[in-house]
């Protein structure tokens, strides 16, 4: 309890030095989930797990009109998910955060519509081209102009995770003349691989398109992973479709294919195909959702 108080006071003191924030608002939100998983094989032990988290957040506005916010999430990993951001509708938003953050690339790694999670969710050893996000990363999101939104992220070098730094960029476009259509592209360069996955410099990219017509949404996405030594090269494609049967009930279907090309890396070097059928039903503040993967 004492350590928690010191962290909170330190963060507040830093904010007061940098900004003069008026009428900051504090909030505490929480959630809980109960999950049952079955991998279709003989299995001993309890299949049920529970997820839980509490988020402490504060926001306010500076004398210059900047909106400043900070949040800390308390969960099974204690207080490792944290973030701070500031910005406005004119300049966009600059953020800094811990392990709960996504890079500009990983934020759009799978944009396919679904009723509950991606087609590869829950698959043992799932192979996904999903960028790289680390602890203490900077991010930027621009205001939307003419349907175009730009985002970027920068992860400084870290001796514990990577020798070099990582940069990512993404852009999305929602044209006014085609209602319901969204297209996007993202790319990321890792100047050195993760200590636990990729072993050399890599470049990843993805492009996607989604179209919504009434209650129906369809999407397609293509991604690519290139490494300096060609030992970790891979390509993936994804397809998804979802349908809102009612305000409460949604159903979805998705597929994901991951293919390698001369890939010898143990973490990324196996071809994989997965499909999923999902559904979700919402009653007030409670949602019952499920997915069946193959």
Predicted regions and their residues:
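Outer-membrane beta-barrel proteins
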Residues: 1-294
């Amino acid at each position: 309890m004492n350590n928690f108080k010191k962290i909170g006071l330190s963060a507040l003191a830093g904010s007061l030095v940098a900004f003069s924030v008026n009428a900051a608002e504090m909030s505490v939100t929480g959630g809980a989930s109960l999950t049952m998983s079955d991998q279709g094989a003989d299995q001993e032990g309890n299949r049920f797990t529970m997820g839980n988290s509490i988020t402490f957040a504060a926001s306010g506005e500076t004398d210059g009109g900047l909106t400043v916010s900070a949040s800390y999430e308390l969960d099974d990993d204690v207080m490792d998910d944290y973030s701070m951001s500031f910005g406005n509708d004119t300049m966009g938003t600059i953020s800094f955060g811990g392990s709960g953050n996504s890079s500009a690339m990983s934020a759009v790694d799978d944009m396919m519509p679904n009723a509950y999670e991606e087609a590869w969710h829950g698959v043992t050893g799932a192979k996904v081209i999903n960028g790289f996000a680390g602890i203490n990363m900077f991010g930027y999101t621009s205001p939307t102009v003419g349907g175009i939104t730009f985002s970027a992220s920068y992860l400084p070098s870290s001796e514990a995770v990577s020798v070099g730094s990582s940069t990512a960029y993404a852009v999305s476009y929602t044209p006014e003349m085609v209602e319901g259509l969204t297209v996007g592209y993202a790319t990321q360069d890792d100047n050195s691989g993760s200590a636990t996955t990729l072993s050399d410099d890599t470049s990843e990219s993805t492009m996607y398109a989604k179209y919504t017509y009434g209650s129906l949404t369809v999407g397609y996405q293509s991604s690519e992973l290139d490494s300096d030594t060609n030992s970790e090269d891979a390509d993936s494609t994804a397809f998804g479709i979802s349908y809102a049967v009612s305000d409460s009930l949604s159903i979805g279907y998705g597929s994901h294919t991951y293919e390698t090309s001369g890939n010898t890396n143990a973490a990324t070097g196996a071809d994989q195909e997965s499909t999923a059928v999902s559904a979700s039903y919402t009653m007030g503040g409670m949602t019952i959702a499920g997915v069946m993967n193959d």
